[in-house]
């Protein structure tokens, strides 16, 4: 799938965002720690893994609701805060669409009991629906347009953004609320990741290091607001300018060693902007050795021959890996930074994937016509890229 914007296609702008994760309870708090390159990871003793690190949302009340599962409750929380900050009216919301992305949905609330939640039996069936996340946002915000839930593993958040962009570009709505939530810190889910050998075994928080051994699981909830207009609105944080996906057709869990699917996805994105600089990439960088190898090979294949390579901005060393919510969280962070004409700094002393690829420890300035790519990769060999422009 290839979907760059070309005239006279309308502008699809990100005009607001909210989030909660281990870095903070709102996007401003999160950005404060991102700008300081401060990680929010800590030992998971309270979650049954005292020798592993991960990230959790401190305010557990955000995930408590009698009608909805914990992921749905968090989606409603971040969506309401984003919409209130933007000032959408009741009429605006009624005509909007909802696109949700989640890898595990409300699994954390029905595979294991959610601490502190007093659920109602009548909602037992709806609480184990992934689509309850989108439905809850629609119900609680009065959104009467399309509602969709995308569940493509760790690429779910970017897919929700991309599909929302296409929906608006086709003229089916003027506004969309994109939410992405994952809560992987339940005993059942953590056990499955550990059994599959995906969690970090040596506590090394450096995704491209030869010694990297796995990811750090983390919770997150994110809402992004999209609006369409003939010209870019003054309130825009940045423009959502393209969306591409490919599949590896290789293995249910392992990354294709040569990174061929990632290469095709990135190549499609680059070709969509022949006269503009690809200034930066937020790579998937989840910390598993297989993903590091595939991603490195793809980056070298696409950009290795370029005299000026895009800088890399790895955000999972700060936020942990929130599965399907990770791409949306990274997009919110990038959009907030781009509004200020900057790219976020990296965690200190990260390894470069290959010679010439800069992983800057300080925030970088953006030019007006720069393009920023965000990459997500999911189990099953699903790859997604979005393009953001100022």
Where are these regions (language model features)?
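Glycine-/small-residue-rich "gating" segment that lines the acyl/pantetheine channel
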Residues: 118-120, 162, 166, 184-234, ...
């Amino acid at each position: 799938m290839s979907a760059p914007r070309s005239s006279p296609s309308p502008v699809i702008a990100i005009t607001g965002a909210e989030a909660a994760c281990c870095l903070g309870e709102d996007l401003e708090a999160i950005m404060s720690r991102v700008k300081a390159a401060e990680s929010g990871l800590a030992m998971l003793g309270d979650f049954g893994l005292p020798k592993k690190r991960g990230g959790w949302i401190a305010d557990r009340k955000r995930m408590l609701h009698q009608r909805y599962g914990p992921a749905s409750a968090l989606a409603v929380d971040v969506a309401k805060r984003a919409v209130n900050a933007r000032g959408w009216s009741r009429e605006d919301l009624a005509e909007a669409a909802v696109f949700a992305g989640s890898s595990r949905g409300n699994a954390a609330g029905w595979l294991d009991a959610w601490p502190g939640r007093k659920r109602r039996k009548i909602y037992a069936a709806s609480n184990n629906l992934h689509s309850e996340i989108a439905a809850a946002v629609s119900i609680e915000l009065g959104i009467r347009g399309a509602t969709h839930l995308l569940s493509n593993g760790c690429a779910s958040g970017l897919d929700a953004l991309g599909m929302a962009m296409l929906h608006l570009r086709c003229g089916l709505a003027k506004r969309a609320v994109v939410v992405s939530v994952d809560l992987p810190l339940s005993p059942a889910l953590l056990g499955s990741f550990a059994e599959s050998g995906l969690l970090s075994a040596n506590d090394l928080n450096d995704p491209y290091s030869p010694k990297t051994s796995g990811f750090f699981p983390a919770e997150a909830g994110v809402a992004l607001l999209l609006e369409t207009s003939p010209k870019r609105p003054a309130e825009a944080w940045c423009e959502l300018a393209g969306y591409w996906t490919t599949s590896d057709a290789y293995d249910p869990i392992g990354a294709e060693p040569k990174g061929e699917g990632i290469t095709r996805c990135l190549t499609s994105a680059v070709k969509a902007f022949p006269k503009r600089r690809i200034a930066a990439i937020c790579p998937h960088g989840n910390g598993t050795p297989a993903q590091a190898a595939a991603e490195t090979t793809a980056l070298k294949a696409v950009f290795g021959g370029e005299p000026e390579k895009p800088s890399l901005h790895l955000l999972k060393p700060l936020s942990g890996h929130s599965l399907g919510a990770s791409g949306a969280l990274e997009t919110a962070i990038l959009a907030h930074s781009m509004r200020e004409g900057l790219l976020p700094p990296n965690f200190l002393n990260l390894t470069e994937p290959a010679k010439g690829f800069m992983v800057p420890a300080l925030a970088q300035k953006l030019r007006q016509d720069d393009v920023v790519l965000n990459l997500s990769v999911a189990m099953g060999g699903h790859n997604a890229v979005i393009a953001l422009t100022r």
